Amino acid sequence: ATGGERAAGPFLQMDLAGYRASFDKLWGYTNVVRLGAEHLSDDGNIVLVSGAPARRAKPGQAAIASVGGAVEQFVRAVTAELAPKRINVVSPGVIDTPMFGNDADARAKMLGGATANNLIPRAGTPEEVAEGIMFVVKNGFVTGTTIDVDGGWILS
């Protein structure tokens, strides 16, 4: 997931203020949609980003899974209200970004372990996520859906 703070770790030990702050991403998205939709042309579209844990969470991912799930359900809930304008979600899996640190060896080891069981056993790239976003931007017949860009992580 992108944007906002991210609480991680076991839910029962998680700082609830951090968990609550994780939802800043959702509130930001709802504000963008609510205030921005009226400025879109009828063939305009909005793309939000969730994350694979929204539909397949691992231990320690309660916050990111909850927020991502809320983002995806929000999109499904408002799609009919926005039509003919379109709104979709792109859901990345593990993506190789500086968020995972600057030490190349440690980063490669961590990403390798995190993606070893993917159907495509590697981390994705920011460019691959951008291609997923551009797909839903360009395809005028796609609305109210979630596109996974996760190397098959959600199915593995």
Q: What are the residue ranges of the model-derived segments?
A:
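Conserved loop-to-helix N-cap of the C-terminal "lid" that shapes the substrate pocket in Rossmann-like
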Residues: V89, A108-L111, I120-A130
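PG/GG-rich flexible active-site loop of Rossmann-like NAD(P)H-dependent oxidoreductases
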Residues: A52-P53, V89-M99, N118, A123, ...
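Conserved NAD(P)H cofactor-binding loop of Rossmann-fold oxidoreductase domains
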Residues: A1-A8, G151-G152
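Rossmann-fold scaffold of SDR-type NAD(P)-dependent oxidoreductases
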Residues: A1-G4, L48, N88-P92
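Conserved Rossmann-fold SDR core element
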Residues: E72, E81-T97, V142-V149
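C-terminal substrate-recognition "lid" of short-chain dehydrogenase/reductases
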Residues: R122-V149, I154
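Catalytic loop of short-chain dehydrogenase/reductase
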Residues: P10-M14, G18-V33, H39-A83, V94-I95, ...
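A glycine/serine/threonine-rich, flexible loop-to-helix segment
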Residues: I95-N117, S156
